[in-house]
């Protein structure tokens, strides 16, 4: 806003108003610049809670039974401003919980329900989430009542779980413990499209081959949770849709049986809404008028609620009794022939060719009126795809099997992004350990830590071997879904022991030394691996003239191969590691951007990333012993040399093929080689500011101290028992 515009707008008395508008940002001017913002989100400045507040402690004081009673009572307390279908909000609440959890994708662990992110853009305004703003607003009195003891993230999912129970399903259990965020997530890549529901072609190598969908995406179009219910790119074809369903659910970590159960169970209750014209709907919540107070898709042209509401555009229920858990979905699917029709909103849907009136569901407002049921193209895929059909027929013949399979799959869906069972809170946490929870047995704490460290120090392992092995064990941790990490020592099991990024030959050499030490000492291998890294760092710090004890908390357990889902762990395989200066192959995304993504998943800040990279380089931990970025002649000493030499203007940096040479500015002699990951710490203005701190003459001890703190954070990232 220019001064002239301010005057013409009524002499705005402050100039800072322009800064609240969408102006030209640094990323607009320099779109290829490294965007470090993803490392600095969800900090204390955006969190309104007191500094000492712990949601995980607060939720333990909740009257869980009372909350469930209130949520169940809400199901049949229809409100005139958004009336419940058939007097029961169950279908709406299930869809809300489903779409919150269903945004999860296994490739990077992002999405999902564990942060309450459905409250914020873009998810709150996705076309597929239309009218879920009403569901959350219906829940507000309960959230208001229980306050800080009940997060939105927990409440959203709990509402779906209780909805199923209120309609007759015996659920598998429920765990509280999801913590709210307070602004939109900046790290999640939802796709490159610039318009909602753009054709699928933009995110596939070939739409005919769903496996070519761009990673880490799982939904077929921008703004959808799963697949297009009308068919691939809105064109009905159940077999083509089946292929997309299979790929999409696989990318969420679901197999074919779970996929069929979830599809059937999700469509046993509730209905779709398309009895009207979509063009009568107002903007989504983010684009709505201020007077709408955060609600979107408001219809001010027609009645727009109840039987006249429009959401997906498809219109109708799937079963005869949409507020009751039963086997009606498969009775309907296999009990009729189906034909393509258009809904009142113009959406493709399948309707029965012939059906008895008593088999039709009643109208949502008038039980004397019967309405034709519908199936989406995804539902027809359960019938037409040979593999899905076989599973569907088995469920049709055995309703108890469907109930059991669905209850477990639903539990998996709504807890998949919560990490190990140790993070679940509440009286309904199932006792059974499930393999997708990455179970780890309890560790031991009663051994002599100093004696173990002494054995490690005398083992003959090098500093680089000890530090690199501990790092590789811990670096798999993802704060997105709390998977991975050093606890369990799965680095010694398939598939991790064979990952190229873990240097299998070097790994086996180190394990052959550390495993006997663990056995002799009564410690877990997981603990000994981390301790070995700590020993290496302490030795390297001492060589730099700094005496330091790296913090250590015993108690990690050792997982077994039987506890490990090898296929499920495949998504955690590192294909790059900027901290060890390695990429598996050339990628479209730059190495420094890959490092940034890994850093965010590990929960590190830009400053922590900087100090760790500088320290790892001088410790000689590069993958394969590569010399790139090792700007020191004292490898194995935890010195500032990486930063000192990177920022030294007596040096000049020149491209040399895929890498760079650091040459003496006067003699042109090659002193070191480097990668883009190394040089970005001198090139990016923010990272250079951090690098200069660690290059200063007065910061040797600070460098060591900060490195140790960041290292300990990585080693303990999955120690949920300590938090």
UniProtKB/Swiss-Prot annotation:
SUPFAM superfamilies hit by this protein: Heme-dependent peroxidases (SSF48113)
Any keyword Nucleotide-binding?
A: no
Where are the residues marked Transition state stabilizer as a site?
Answer: 95
Q: Where is this cross-link: Tryptophyl-tyrosyl-methioninium (Trp-Tyr) (with M-252)?
A: 98-226
A Gene Ontology cellular component where this protein is annotated is:
cytosol
Copy out the cofactor comment. Binds 1 heme b (iron(II)-protoporphyrin IX) group per dimer.
Extract the InterPro entries matched here: Catalase_peroxidase, Haem_peroxidase, Haem_peroxidase_sf, Peroxidases_AS
Entry's EC annotation: 1.11.1.21
Its domain of life? Answer: Bacteria
Cofactor(s) it depends on: heme b
Output the PTM entry: Formation of the three residue Trp-Tyr-Met cross-link is important for the catalase, but not the peroxidase activity of the enzyme.
In the record, biological process GO terms are:
cellular response to hydrogen peroxide; hydrogen peroxide catabolic process
Here the cross-link named Tryptophyl-tyrosyl-methioninium (Tyr-Met) (with W-98) sits at 226-252
Q: Which CDD domains match?
A: catalase_peroxidase_1 (cd00649), catalase_peroxidase_2 (cd08200)
Q: What reaction gets catalysed by this protein?
A: H2O2 + AH2 = A + 2 H2O; 2 H2O2 = O2 + 2 H2O
Q: Which UniProt keywords apply?
A: Heme, Hydrogen peroxide, Iron, Metal-binding, Oxidoreductase, Peroxidase
Report residue spans for region: Disordered.
267-286
Residue numbers binding heme b: 267
- What's an example of a GO molecular-function annotation for this chain? metal ion binding
Catalytic residue positions: 99 (proton acceptor)
Q: Which family does it belong to?
A: Belongs to the peroxidase family. Peroxidase/catalase subfamily.
Q: What role does it play?
A: Bifunctional enzyme with both catalase and broad-spectrum peroxidase activity.
Q: What is this protein called?
A: Catalase-peroxidase
What organism does the record attribute this protein to?
Thioalkalivibrio sulfidiphilus (strain HL-EbGR7)
């Amino acid at each position: 806003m220019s001064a002239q515009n301010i005057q013409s707008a009524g002499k705005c008395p402050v100039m800072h108003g322009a800064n609240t508008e969408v102006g030209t940002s640094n990323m607009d001017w320099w779109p290829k610049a490294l965007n470090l913002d993803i490392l600095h989100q969800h900090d204390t400045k955006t969190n309104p809670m007191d500094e000492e507040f712990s949601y995980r402690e607060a939720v333990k004081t909740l009257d869980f039974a009372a909350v469930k009673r209130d949520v169940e009572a809400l199901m049949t307390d229809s409100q005139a401003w958004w009336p419940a279908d058939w007097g029961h909000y169950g279908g709406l609440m299930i869809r809300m919980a489903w779409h919150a959890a269903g945004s999860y994708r296994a490739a990077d662990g992002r999405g999902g329900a564990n942060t309450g992110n459905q409250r914020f853009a873009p998810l709150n305004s996705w076309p597929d989430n239309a009218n879920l703003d009403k569901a959350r607003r219906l829940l507000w009195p309960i959230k208001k009542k229980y306050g800080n003891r009940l997060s939105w993230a927990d409440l959203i999912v709990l509402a779906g779980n209780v909805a199923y129970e209120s309609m007759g399903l015996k659920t598998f259990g429920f765990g509280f413990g999801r913590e709210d965020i307070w602004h939109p997530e900046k790290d999640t890549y939802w796709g490159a499209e610039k318009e909602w529901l753009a054709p699928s072609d933009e995110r596939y190598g070939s739409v005919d081959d769903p496996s070519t969908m761009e990673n880490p995406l799982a939904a077929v179009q921008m703004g959808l949770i799963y697949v297009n219910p009308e068919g691939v790119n809105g064109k009905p074809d159940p077999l083509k849709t089946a292929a997309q369903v299979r790929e999409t659910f696989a990318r969420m970590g679901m197999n074919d049986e779970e996929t069929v159960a979830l599809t059937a169970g999700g469509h046993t209750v509730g209905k779709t809404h398309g009895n009207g014209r979509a063009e009568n709907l107002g903007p989504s919540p983010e684009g709505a008028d201020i007077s709408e107070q955060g609600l979107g898709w408001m219809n001010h042209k027609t009645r727009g609620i109840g039987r006249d509401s429009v959401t997906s555009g498809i219109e109708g229920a799937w079963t005869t009794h949409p507020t009751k858990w039963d086997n009606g979905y498969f009775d309907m699917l296999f009990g009729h022939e189906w034909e393509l029709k258009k809904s009142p909103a113009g959406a493709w849907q399948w309707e029965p060719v012939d059906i008895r009136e008593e088999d039709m569901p009643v109208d949502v407002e008038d039980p004397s009126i019967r309405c034709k049921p519908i199936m989406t193209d995804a539902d027809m895929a359960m019938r037409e795809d040979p593999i899905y059909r076989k599973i569907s027929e088995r469920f049709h013949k055995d309703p108890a099997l469907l109930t059991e399979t669905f209850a477990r799959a639903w539990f998996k869906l709504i807890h998949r992004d919560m990490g190990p069972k140790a993070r679940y809170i509440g009286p309904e946490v199932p006792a059974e350990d499930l393999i997708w929870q990455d179970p780890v047995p309890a560790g031991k704490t009663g051994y002599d830590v100093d004696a173990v460290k002494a054995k490690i120090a005398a083992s003959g392992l090098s500093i680089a071997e000890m530090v690199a092995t501990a790092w590789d064990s811990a670096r798999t941790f993802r704060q997105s879904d709390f998977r991975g990490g050093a606890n369990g020592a799965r680095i010694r099991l398939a598939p991790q022991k064979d990952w190229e990024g873990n240097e299998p030959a070097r790994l086996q050499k180190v394990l052959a030394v550390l495993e006997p030490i663990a056995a002799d000492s009564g410690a877990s291998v997981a603990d000994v691996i981390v301790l070995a890294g700590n020993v290496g760092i302490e030795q390297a710090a001492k060589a730099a003239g700094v005496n330091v004890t790296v913090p250590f908390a015993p108690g990690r357990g050792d997982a077994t191969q039987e506890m490990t889902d090898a296929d499920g762990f495949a998504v955690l395989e590192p294909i790059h590691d900027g901290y060890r200066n390695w990429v598996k192959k050339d990628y479209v995304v730059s190495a420094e951007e890959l490092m940034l993504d890994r850093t965010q998943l590990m929960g590190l800040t830009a400053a922590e990333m900087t100090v760790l990279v500088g320290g790892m380089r001088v410790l000689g931990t590069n993958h394969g012993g590569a010399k790139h970025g090792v700007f020191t002649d004292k490898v194995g000493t935890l010195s500032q040399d990486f930063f000192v030499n990177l920022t030294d203007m007596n040096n000049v940096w020149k491209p040399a093929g895929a890498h760079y040479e650091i040459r003496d500015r006067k003699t042109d002699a090659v002193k070191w080689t480097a990668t883009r990951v190394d040089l970005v710490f001198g090139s990016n203005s923010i990272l250079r500011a951090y690098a200069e701190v660690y290059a200063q003459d007065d910061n040797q001890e600070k460098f060591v101290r900060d490195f140790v703190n960041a290292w300990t954070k990585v080693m303990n990232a999955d120690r949920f028992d300590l938090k």
